[in-house]
Amino acid sequence: GYAPRQRFDLSVNILTNNAINKKKITVFGGKQLRPNLHIQDYCDVVKLFLSAPSEKINNQIFNVGYQNMSISEISEIVKRVVQKEFSLYKEIPIITTKSDDNRSYHINSDKIKQILGFKPNRSVEDAVKELCISFKKGLFKNSIDNDFYFNVKRLKRIQAS
């Protein structure tokens, strides 16, 4: 979803950015899993930790995620939502290519639900809809090439200067 310090190097965000600006989605591999958590749900977790009794969270490690999905599943959601939100985009193709990057992440967040009662309220679809609205408002300038939105590119530029 939208964030004041937007990143387009995260799976949902980069796929949405490409669907809107390149009018296509390129998926490298596609079977890799990613846990997803909406930025507002993450903010809710931070508030929850700040207000939680210390005896419940002291020396504890919590996974916080939601919707473990494959990159291919995410790309299908992005395609559907962007085509709906941008009616001029009749058909956004999904191009799947081979990938040398087979990293796959999935997590179990049952512990935070059991101990603190946390359950995310927002979905990947909600995040894509928010991004579409933000793009329509013109909130992202040159979001394909501007290294402001890409942590590794930004750090390399800063390091080189």
Task: Give the predicted meaning of each segment.
Residues 22-23, 27-161:
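C-terminal substrate-binding subdomain of Rossmann-fold SDR/epimerase-dehydratase oxidoreductases
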Residues 1-10:
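Flexible, glycine-rich beta-alpha linker
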Residues 14-15, 99:
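Short beta-strand/turn micro-motifs at beta-sheet edges
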Residues 17-21:
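Active-site Tyr-X1-5-Lys
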